[in-house]
Amino acid sequence: MKTLEKKHPLAIRWFHWINFPVLLIMVWSGLLIYWANPVYRIGVGKHTLMKMTVKEPVYEKWHIAFRLGEGISLHFFFMWFFAINGIAYVLYTIFSGEWRYLVPDRRSFKESFLVVLHDLRLRKEAPPQRKYNAAQRISYSAIILMGLGSLLTGLAIYKPVQFAWLTWLFGGYQMARFFHFWITVGYVLFFVVHIAQVIKTGWSNFRAMIIGVEVGEARGD
């Protein structure tokens, strides 16, 4: 006999599915902006400690043209959707009590190691599973912090004069760009792992993020 278990509230599902295309557009438009100046410099004053750049063949292979204006327009337009959706998600999570399922507790870091071993088939026994497992709680909470980092570094880059104090906190304009870039790389890596986990866990888990309930098997007496 099949059972239905409530999994994700409607608001959480809306935030999730709004953020998905918006973040993809933000990453793509960010690549268009980055292509205009792919050099990152880390230094103190005029002294350069490190330079990093993505070589042109990468962009040539992906057929990314010089479309700086288009990239800036898309990035600055969709950043408002990204920011508003993210802030609304955090506020909802706090006031609805959903944070209790999301924020890691003192057991999460130990249990997350068990989750990784189980996913790699190095451990047969399934780790403790609540609404989110320990690895999910850590990674989803990290994504929220990364979102905050994106907004703050983005402001430091977008308005380095008006938010000079913020740009200074990140170590200057180039360092803010550097952090912004690597946070974006983190999003891409998270996205790859997230999709792989969705495929691994199957249709029922994916469907729960659409309709809000998970279909399971009733336990016998």
Sequence positions of predicted segments:
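Membrane-embedded alpha-helical bundles that constitute the cytochrome b-like, heme-associated redox core
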Residues: 1-221
